[in-house]
Every structure is written in structure tokens, then in C-alpha cells.
Amino acid sequence: MISIVTPVYNEDGNVVYFHDEVTKVMQTLDMDYEIIYVNDGSKDRTDELIHQLAAGDPHVRALTFARNFGHQIAITCGMDFAVGDAVITMDGDMQHPPALIPKLIQKWQEGYDIVQTKRTATEDAGPIKKLTSAGYYAVINSISNSPVVPGGSDFRLMDRKALDAFLRFREHSRFIRGIVGGLGFKQCTIEFEAPARHAGVSKFSMKKMLHFAMDGIITNSTLPLRVAFYLGVLAAVAGILLILHVLYCVMMDEAVPGWATMTILIAIFGSLNLMGLGIIGEYLGRMFEETRNRPLYWLSDDTAAHLDNPYRVSHKKV
């Protein structure tokens, strides 16, 4: 069986069309399948639509979060419930083309445990987004021990044994591309051109993108902490040089630099201190979240009504 996991957030203009396209593709394959939709706290008719799909198609299971938990947690939730021998994760806005599913399955049947995808082009991505994306992946791959496919996406196939290994990672601040890259197993990458969204606009705001980028760096590397240390060393060296310069001026009976220089240096050193504290705070904040050991998510509804997940809560309690 193939499990297809699709997180949806305010996608009432896409989800039915997406479902029809995925169903057409899966019906051409001689394989049993399930489609799991995870509603990540949508405010539109998305929840109503996925419940209608579940009522009319026995292959569909609709899971509804009690509130918004985020894209990465929604993917993880769908994986928790998936029962397939392989699981395909993909977005429901048609930028992950369903036509590529047979190729993912083919690579899996050839013996690959994880089949990644890489966007070679995105129709609705501007030059600034492309440049910042390329720079981000260059940075994260230079500082992380877990390789991340440049231009990669969360459109991938994972074999059951790779999925079971992935599901042992339960951190709240998660960057799935980094986790999957560090799993090992036999992996390959398929390139594709991402079409424009079928309808609507991206729900991935600038704030969410920055948070996603920060999670990718902090959860995959401790280099920012070392950078803060190195900057502190440089600041200390600069301070020593300034002291030597002042002593030289005193010995040579020259005028000691005035308040402007001192004010600038104090501002610089103060900024470095605050930056270092901010970096440490990011790590400590994430550590605090993990030590509370709260569930990754909880559900308000599950159309399969199976009590097979510890995070499910009754609809009345939400």
C-alpha cells in the first residue's frame, strides 16, 4: 500500500482538484493506496471539503487539528497515521505535481528507501526568492552535518523502515528536510519543475519563512553559538588593541581619542553582547519547549475514528 500525506491550510480552492488529480494517477497504478489529509487549523471550507472527500471515497482519511500547529507538524501527523509500505508527502496546492508520483514509486521499487525531489524551477517564484533560497541552502549545508538537497521540498517518498526511523524524532522545532537528510538509508533525488498554484496564494508568509529558516539552522547546527563566541573573541582583541593605543598615546604625550570613539565602541560591543544573548536565547527557548514534553499536536476530529494515536482528543474537549 502507498500512503499519500497532504497537509492543508486554507486550501478550499485547491483540495478537491488536487484530490481528483491524485486519484486519477493512483487509479492507473496496480496498487492499493490511502490519502491522508491533515487540516492544519484552516479558517475556510477546507475541513468541510476533506470530510466530504472522506465520506465519498474509502481511500481518504481526514484528520483535523484542534488548532494550527504548522506545516512540519502536520506532515508528521499524517506520517504517524499512515499504514502504507511507503509514504509520499506532498502539498495540496498542485505545486507538487501528482504526475510525478509514478516516478517516485518506480525509484522505490528499484530499491531506494528515500526518494527526494528537487525544484529546478518554480513558475511563481521571483528572482529575489530564488536568490535567497540558494543562499540559504548554501549556508545550511556548510554548517550542518545533515545534508539538505538545495532546492529541495517536502515532496518525497519514504519506505516504511525509513519512516519508522523518522518517527522516532519527536522534537517540536523540526526541519524535516534536515532530519530526512541525516537519516541515511539509500536515497536518490528526482528533479521537477514546480508549476504555479492551481488557485489562491501561498499561506507561507514572510514571518513563517523566517521561522522555518531559523528552525533549519538552529536544529541542524550549533555553529551560531560558536559564531557568537568568535565575535566575542574579536571584540576582546579589538578592546585590547584600543587599550594599547591609549597607552601609546599617553606615553607619547598625545591626545587620547575622545568620547566619539568610545561611544562607537561601546555601541558595537553592546550590540555583539545582545546578539550573543539572542542566539543563546533561541537555543535555550527550544530546549525549554522540548523539556516540557508536550505532545506535538492533538486532533479535534478523525474520520476513521480510530483511537490508535495518543495525541487524539475527543471533539467535545476542544
What is the role of each PLM region?
Residues M31-G41, L63-T64:
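Short beta-strand/loop segment that forms part of the nucleotide-sugar
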Residues N14-Y17, D44-L53:
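Acidic helix N-cap motif at the loop->helix transition within catalytic regions
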Residues F175-V318:
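Hydrophobic helical membrane-anchoring modules
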Residues Q52, H59-R67, H71-F81, P98-I179, ...:
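Acceptor/aglycone-binding surface of glycosyltransferases and processive sugar-polymer synthases
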Residues V87:
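Short aromatic/hydrophobic "clamp" motif used to bind/position activated sugar donors
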Residues M1-S3, E34:
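Cell-envelope/extracellular polymer assembly enzymes that use nucleotide-activated donors
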Residues E11-M26:
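Short, well-formed alpha-helical segments that are part of the catalytic scaffolds
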Residues N39-D47, M94-Q95:
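A conserved acidic beta->alpha catalytic loop
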